[in-house]
Amino acid sequence: MLKMLKYMKKSIGWIVLIVALLFVQAYSDLALPEYTSQIVDTGIQQKGIPDAVPEKIRETTLNGLTMLMEPDDADQVTAAYTEAEDGICELKDIRDEEREELNDSLGLAMMVSMTLSSEGIDISQVPQEQIQMMLEQADEQKEQISDSIVTQMAVTFVQQEYAAMGEDLDQIQMNYLIRSGLQMLGLALISMLAAVLVTFLASRVAALLGHDLRNMVYRKVISFSSAEMNHFSTASLITRSTNDIQQVQMLMTMVFRIVLYAPIIGIGGITKVLETESGMTWILAVAVAALAVLIVTLLVVAMPRFRKLQTLIDRLNLITREILTGLSVIRAFSTEKHEEERFEEANHRLMKTNLFVNRCMTFMMPLMMLIMNGISVLIVYVGAHHIDEGALQVGDMMAFIQYTMQIIMAFLMISMLSVMLPRASVSANRIAEILDTEVSIREPEQPKKPSEDRKGEVAFSHVSFRYPGAEEEVLHDITFTAKKGETVAFIGSTGSGKSTLVNLIPRFFDVTEGAICIDGVDIRDMDIKDLRSRLGYVPQKGVLFSGTIESNLRFGAQEASMEELNKAADIAQASEFIAAKDDGMQSPIAQGGTNVSGGQ
């Protein structure tokens, strides 16, 4: 598959944009569980109060809290609020770092204050030495108490303070929920827009790759000599030019849309899970290990059959093409039954291989879902114990589940790749095999032109020829000269090399030994197009292309006039049957000339 990447250079800009959009989508998707956690924990449980830092506080309450702090902390808290108006202090604009420091100082002070209030102790009546002792005890206890419990006590204190000031707690909660909900909606829309753009661009890049590969394969095949055509076979070249390129194109769409996204969302999800400090990271390790074992096992079992699949498709195409091409011969010799059995055998082998591969892959999704649901149950079970101990909040557990599911989905995406990758990889190698094939008939670096003095002379000088891979020579030490105006005929039994000898002149094959010269120039030193333009070649089997009679007559001379076309038809003794047709030169010709007789 890596060989295909070098053919995507013209799309590098689009690929960079796709990766950037995938990061945007991943950022949005990873932010949503965090907002869900905040809505549950802060919006619902804490009534919209996020931490121990109140937006408003009575001056008397603030003074009471500062008495329960170290002097430096008290000064920092006092500086963060405006001077009292009507006995109310308001929080200034502060940075997030400052808010975290205030949260730590106020949270501890509020916890101590609530403890004293529950015991009916007035803080203003407590000596400073005793306050200092209580703070030291609170610090020691804080190390044993989870942050969640401290936060809950501080939030309760803030709620009571807001109620004492006459604030509408329901409205505060509703404002927080609406604000968080709109932020979630915005992120969801950004994620959706990024996903749509990625899908569009991925399809565009993959389609462009398919277009370029088809063009390159076509140009390469056109340059093949008969030796390369015999090596690949026509059926195989058709499969490689269509089905194989389609497989690669589909895979590249998945790579850009899903496979690149999987590691981004997976690594991001793992990072978020580690940041939660939930104590359940080991569950994630269990999930990843189970998924890895599942995917590797399925790949080991199915990969050999995937490699075999394309070969079987080639075989089926070959038999189908042979049957359709030789249909009249099959009917003439009444071998329909034999050909049916031959086709059925190839078709059955392809079906069995496909069934095996599909059965292997059908296990993947149910097992993935089993692992996913099992991990969810395990998280809820373990998380419930942590919540009961006060070490975890419900929203954090929900976020942990969502992050874990995102990580598992990343592996699920990669497993989808494992379904297509083996087959597409084989297809990519088969395409690369065509593109990397060295053409045996090459253009000379410095082409020569034949002498005008000896126009029309063809000379064979000690020519020998052996087909690629053959042990014996078809032609051995052939020497003769055909001069201008002479008619030379080759007479011999079947397989004696008559057609082979003629095929050497237009360089369908190159001689093994010796040389063929036209007007004194070795044909290997001539430009191939120039060489073939000097020859009139009539193949043993007539070939017509789909189109019209005129388009087929123009095949060797696109700029020919109607007078020249009529002259060619007269020479070929075709004028009579062309004139008899209603549309004349514009009469349609089917592929292979199947709608005209053999003589025509």
Feature map (PLM): residue ranges:
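ABC transporter TMD-NBD coupling linker
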Residues: Q46, E322-T325, E341, D388, ...
